[in-house]
Amino acid sequence: MIRRGDVYLADLSPVQGSEQGGVRPVVIIQNDTGNKYSPTVIVAAITGRINKAKIPTHVEIEKKKYKLDKDSVILLEQIRTLDKKRLKEKLTYLSDDKMKEVDNALMISLGLNAVVHQKN
């Protein structure tokens, strides 16, 4: 079963403009209820072209810890809904601590941090 925090290889083509494309790693960010029942899944692209977070929506992942080819960055500004048929193979899964970083970057990407601060 596909779970939130899993890292898969996925085929992201075709793309337009600045979208991440080709077969590349993605992290599952959709909740597990959606993962169980929906034919689609929400993912964030991972790139190995940069190995350091450059903006607040980036999360670094280490190649040794996560068995990747190179140090990489999760791009939480590059979120896509994919048909599950685009997922090729599971590579690894992210730790709870790393998923907290993903959640924080996702909140920034979607502007949810402003909503939280306004309620306080």
Curated annotation (Swiss-Prot):
Gene Ontology MF terms in the entry: DNA binding; RNA binding; RNA endonuclease activity
Domain of life: Bacteria
InterPro entries noted in UniProt: PemK-like, Plasmid_toxin/cell-grow_inhib
GO BP annotation list: mRNA catabolic process; rRNA catabolic process
Gene3D superfamilies linked: 2.30.30.110
Enzyme Commission (EC) number: 3.1.-.-
Enzyme class, spelled out: hydrolase
Keywords: Endonuclease, Hydrolase, Nuclease, RNA-binding, Toxin-antitoxin system
Family statement: Belongs to the PemK/MazF family.
Annotated function: Toxic component of a type II toxin-antitoxin (TA) system. Ribosome-independent, sequence-specific endoribonuclease that cleaves mRNA, thus inhibiting protein synthesis and inducing bacterial stasis. It cuts between the first and nucleotides of 5'-UACAU-3' in single-stranded RNA. Neutralized by coexpression with cognate antitoxin MazE.
Subunit and interaction comment: Forms a complex with MazE which is no longer active as an endoribonuclease.
Protein name, UniProt field: Endoribonuclease MazF
Organism from which the protein derives: Staphylococcus aureus (strain MRSA252)
